[in-house]
Amino acid sequence: MRDRLPDLTACRKNDDGDTVVVVEKDHFMDDFFHQVEEIRNSIDKITQYVEEVKKNHSIILSAPNPEGKIKEELEDLNKEIKKTANKIRAKLKAIEQSFDQDESGNRTSVDLRIRRTQHSVLSRKFVEAMAEYNEAQTLFRERSKGRIQRQLEITGRTTTDDELEEMLESGKPSIFTSDIISDSQITRQALNEIESRHKDIMKLETSIRELHEMFMDMAMFVETQGEMINNIERNVMNATDYVEHAKEETKKAIKYQSKARRKKWIIIAVSVVLVAIIALIIGLSVGK
């Protein structure tokens, strides 16, 4: 390893002629950990946004004609998640690209190892948050599709899953609704909900497509780095278990040592008594 002491220290003399050693603090890792904290906070924000998205999904699905305010709020949340996710991805990419420079530069292997580990952990945390978001979007799509199917049944039109998917992919709900006569209020309400749910799904699929590439890109990285993270976690757990085991063994050793010390003093005392008795017997024998 290269000696970094000359880089970190400098000498100067004060007015009295004494040598003063000035230690220059390495701000590189401080800046890195600050960036790590920013990324972690952004991921936590996405997790919070996803919970709000789920609540709005439930409200929209429970009402035949949900208020426009709720849908606007949902759309704003989706935009915020997308914007935050793109920022996180850009920061993680920048960190990843800096690894090559670090390897060819003057960074220590310890610093580089720390940076790689932090990057891997953040990437996996990010993918987990986006996977939860994707799961919420997929569930909302399926439940919205179920509502469309039920409303079509109300109008007297029975459809299969394949037929529903065909309608959604075409973007034209009129494929199934054009020949339905809205001769009653119930039928008109059903047709309105079919159209509304269809629009919701169209917006949803656009959002899913936009995030798919980013999600897959990060998921692939995490998959390749997953074994390294698992090894780190396994080593940490093993170290923790070893420390606990060492504590127990130390306690046993102390207890055993204490017992052994007591036995030693008992043996010494018994030996002294035996020597005294033998000396007494010899003394009496000689006296006779």
From Swiss-Prot:
One of its GO terms (biological process) is acrosome reaction. It is found in: Membrane. GO terms for molecular function: calcium-dependent protein binding; identical protein binding; SNAP receptor activity; SNARE binding; structural molecule activity. Keywords: Coiled coil, Membrane, Transmembrane, Transmembrane helix. Residues 191-253 form the t-SNARE coiled-coil homology domain. It is a single-pass type IV membrane protein. This is Syntaxin-2. The gene is STX2.
